[in-house]
Amino acid sequence: MDRAIPDPTWKRLGFAEQPDFHTSGLGVGIVIIIIDSIKQHHLVNHLNTRIKCVAVHENMTVSVRDISSMNREEDNRKGEHGLMSVLALAHEPILLEEQIHVGIAPAATLIVLDHGAFTTGEGERLKKGMEWILEHGVEWNIKIILSTGWQALDNEVYLKNTSENSTVKALATAVQQGILVICSNGNTRLNNIMPPIQYLAVGGYVDRGKADRSLHVPFPDEPYGRNGDGHFRPDILAPRLHLTIPSYETEDSGQRVSFYGGTSGSATLVAGVAAHLFSQFPSLSAEMLRHLLVEHGEPLEGNDNLAPRINVENTIRYMNRADKPRYITKTLPMISIKNQNLYSAIHSIDDTERALSLTVLVERDELSREELWSFTKDSSAIVRKIAVSTLGEPMNEQERKLYWVHLMHETEGGVRGWYMHGLLQNAPKEEIHNWIKWSTDINWSVRWCVSEYLAQYPEYFPQLEKTQDPDAIHIKALPLREWYTAL
């Protein structure tokens, strides 16, 4: 191993003791809507009939089968994301450096819904699959839907009301039936869109693999703010890096653990917590559970993101009180520009209204390039991201120089990412002097662009290894920086 084994995920979530392998999540069904599929692996065989794969095919027929009966995929990467989610939820106990690691809800029933995500017609297939599960899977007692790719095929920068999203439309019936939808809030500030208020949106933070909360810090590229309806997202934060699961990559590698990460991992852990609580407190409603997790989370000091860190023990302690008050559901107003003049709304004092208007005008192709440039000076990063992403790559050498100037003065990481993405297109090797300094930017997409730029010229430049870990950014960039200093 090239790193110390982190604390068990259950400790990092604030459990006072490890989840019981036989009872945590018992009687609770979780539908996992994944971004690819799931592959068969011996590490999930212990789930036996408690794990199913429901597939919706292009002709809208539905099939269901046990994961254990599936053939091993020839493509070893296919189904990996789904497998990691299942392992984080339900892997068997393993002893690592005198600490027991176990899935958060190993007794739950897991239904993996493969609906051909991120391909044309996915919304209709997702709706069909959920309808089938709710009709035919009564014995599964579905209480939770875990979605790690809710955005579907939407442009993730263009801001719209969330009701227009195909996933939101497909899951509307399930939400109305009181099923808790838990979804990842997004991995980088490069994007604008965030989940609807009806979902429990999960962001992440850096816990350095430790349960000790004094060591926790914000993730520097964490997306947060108002979604297309004007509602603040995310609701809650969970660890997002170095989430331990049993090693699944090669059975003879000698490795004992693999690592899950990103807000897909964070959301999966929270789904496990929800299943654990539903099994302990069967009378809990989805709305009440969501409220309790947020209300009894812990603020993260030094963070502008208002979402708290999850703390399971705080929530359980409150639930065990006899005098707990009743929770009253609140309905928040939604921002909409449907009845407004776009050319008036584009100058609104509300940045969400400006972003919604700019999105419509851009999609209608009603703005000149000069007008788009004017929106790169907007006070809102949401608006600037839409403008810069729409500009795309520089049109000529003069505009390319302007990109570099704007990049230098841009304070928001996501906007910098879009300038860098534009500059990456047709970038000459002679520009190396402009690229080096961005190898340690806090924004993932900026560093990704630097890495991709260097990869275009491997015979000329050292390479930059990509990392999501903010503590490793400068370490990964050190060889490149030392090479450049020695020139």
Identify the residue ranges that each predicted region occupies.
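C-terminal subdomain of the subtilisin-like protease fold in secreted/lumenal serine endopeptidases
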Residues: 142-145, 279-344, 348-360
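Amphipathic alpha-helical scaffolding segments comprising HEAT/armadillo-like alpha-solenoid repeats
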Residues: 336-345, 365-376, 396-408, 428-438, ...
